[in-house]
Amino acid sequence: MAVPANEDRPKVPESEKITINLGFVDLGQIDLLVSDGSRANRTDFIRTAIRNQLGRHDEVVRKAAARKQLDLGLRYFSRADLEALRDAGQTVNVHVLGLASIASDVSPQLALQTIESITVLGALHASPAVKAALGERIR
């Protein structure tokens, strides 16, 4: 039971930091294009390149997400959401392509009682205690 987009929830970052290794020549070519004004900086160049590649594979991504029954975008689980599930004797299997966020006031016990499994392709934001409690249920 995810919270609709218009309800209040904590602000989450719009991106996740990653580290990549590039060959010296590739990096030099990026720097050359940046210095010639093709892009504002390395990050802008790499983001654009990634978006272009994802755009070329959009159909494949959409079909795979549908086949794996992944929810696309942001899914936020508040304490009230999970308490309602618990009180109804229900659990949830979370399948997200994007960001799954569990409220900071959710206890590890409540998460264990209500989240049967969690699959996130992207990022999972939850307290360290909740992540540890759900450890074996995170795929």
Residue ranges and their predicted role:
Residues 15-32:
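Short amphipathic alpha-helix starts
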Residues 55-88:
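Short, positively charged interaction helices/loops
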Residues 5-11, 28-32, 40-64:
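Short, basic amphipathic alpha-helical segments that act as recognition/interaction helices
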Residues 88-105, 109:
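Long, contiguous alpha-helical segments
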Residues 128, 134-139:
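Compositionally biased, non-globular sequence tracts
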Residues 69, 74, 93, 99, ...:
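Detector for repetitive beta-architecture
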